[in-house]
Amino acid sequence: MGKRASKLKPEEVEELKQQTYFTEAEIKQWHKGFRKDCPDGKLTLEGFTKIYQQFFPFGDPSKFANFVFNVFDENKDGFISFGEFLQALSVTSRGTVEEKLKWAFRLYDLDNDGFITRDELLDIVDAIYRMVGESVRLPEEENTPEKRVNRIFQVMDKNKDDKLTFDEFLEGSKEDPTIIQALTLCDSGQA
């Protein structure tokens, strides 16, 4: 797409149709909005965080937005291109449960070593609690990030090695539907 975000070429639309769950019309509509918000075709961390602040005005979404930004930014060039944006949106809004869980696993596995440690999960859960602020009432057994992480590890960490593999995460998510429900924070309702 060059330096300036221009109209999508037919081959770009076709490629995005193959890589996402969106139709040609939807891709063009999303691109139009993306170009309006990011005329240079690049969504920065600052811009991404502002979007989260609109959705979570009573908390501080900056830490969580940073974690999500890092997953969206597939090629790690410091910004989100339209293609990266649309592919992540496709998975989080229309992907299968397993695709959403793979995406979430990548989000939680902060150092990309193939495991989610207790500290990594605590970082993410703490960021989520900061983001939602006081707007969400949590049950006593989950009213702190530490309690939530302990509960998740009780359910998921089958071999008790203090780290979660993707298989443990997948199986645990099936046992604890609240994991899936948390993923629908990203869901546009079009799944």
UniProtKB/Swiss-Prot annotation:
Residues 24-59, 60-95, 96-131, 144-179 form the EF-hand domain. PROSITE patterns: EF_HAND_1, EF_HAND_2. Ca(2+) 1 binds at D73, N75, D77, E84. The keyword Calcium applies. It comes from Aplysia californica (California sea hare). This is Neuronal calcium sensor 1. Ca(2+) 2 binds at D109, D111, D113, E120. Keywords: Calcium, Lipoprotein, Metal-binding, Myristate, Repeat. The keyword Protease does not apply. The lineage of its organism: Eukaryota, Metazoa, Spiralia, Lophotrochozoa, Mollusca. GO terms for molecular function: calcium ion binding; calcium sensitive guanylate cyclase activator activity. Neuronal calcium sensor, regulator of G protein-coupled receptor phosphorylation in a calcium dependent manner. Regulates neurite extension and branching by activity-dependent (Ca2+) influx in growth cones. Ca(2+) 3 binds at D157, N159, D161, K163, E168. Binds 3 calcium ions via the second, third and fourth EF-hand. It holds the Pfam family EF-hand_1. Belongs to the recoverin family. A lipid is attached at G2 (N-myristoyl glycine). CDD domains: EFh (cd00051). InterPro entries: EF-hand-dom_pair (IPR011992), EF_Hand_1_Ca_BS (IPR018247), EF_hand_dom (IPR002048), Recoverin (IPR028846).
